[in-house]
A protein has these predicted regions:
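Residue-level signal for beta-strand positions within conserved beta-sheet cores that form or flank
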Residues: 24, 64, 111
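Short coil-to-beta-strand
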Residues: 59-72
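Active-site flanking residues adjacent to catalytic metal/cofactor-binding acidic residues
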Residues: 9, 68, 117
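Basic/polar, cationic surfaces and motifs that engage anionic cell-wall
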Residues: 1-4, 71-166
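N-terminal catalytic cores of peptidoglycan-degrading enzymes
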Residues: 1-61, 131, 137-139, 151, ...
Length: 166
């Protein structure tokens, strides 16, 4: 059984292109057109983070977690002002496909504790974060709020998993 037990979705606070900082912090990054870019670390690096060589994407929740991020949201201020680089439908769909792939590969069931956004870590897992709100707005889907966005991530991932299993 895999030691990787959850997938956490983020945004990178960038324009629509992946940068080196994102590659150091996430396992998979999705550019504005949906292109997947691998990070510097494989998900397996996060099976045990004691060596310090892993993708550090979520405070006190990196061990056992795979980090996915949309290259987006530079200039975002709050859910009503997502800036000039909001998450696109293409990258959201590609990220959900990537999460579904990793869930299938590692036997991760889709629940609010195993597939979630960074904005849900504190409420769903009880791990204190520092005011993180990624992903709490999805303008392409006209959604605001961590739970609403997390529910869309989970339902999209689940639908993709079901199609994979047909």
């Amino acid at each position: 059984m895999s030691k990787l037990v959850r997938c956490i979705a983020h945004w990178a606070v960038t324009r629509y292109k992946c940068d080196e900082v994102s590659k150091a912090h996430y396992h998979f990054i999705y550019e504005g057109d949906g292109k997947e870019v691998p990070g510097h670390f494989t998900p397996e690096a996060n099976e045990n983070t004691a060596d310090g060589k892993y993708a550090a994407h979520t405070r006190h929740c990196n061990t056992g977690s795979i980090g996915f991020s949309c290259a987006a949201m530079l200039g975002a201020i709050d859910v009503d002002r997502p800036g000039k680089f909001p998450i696109t439908a293409a990258q959201f769909d590609a990220m959900c496909a990537g999460i579904a792939r990793e869930c299938k590969k590692r036997g991760i069931k889709v629940t609010p504790k195993t597939v979630l956004s960074h904005a849900e870590v504190e409420s769903n897992l009880g791990i204190k974060q520092r005011g993180k709100w990624d992903i709490a707005v999805l303008p392409h889907a006209n959604l605001k709020g961590a739970k609403a966005c997390g529910d869309l991530i989970r339902s999209t991932v689940q639908a993709k998993l079901e199609r994979m299993n047909q």
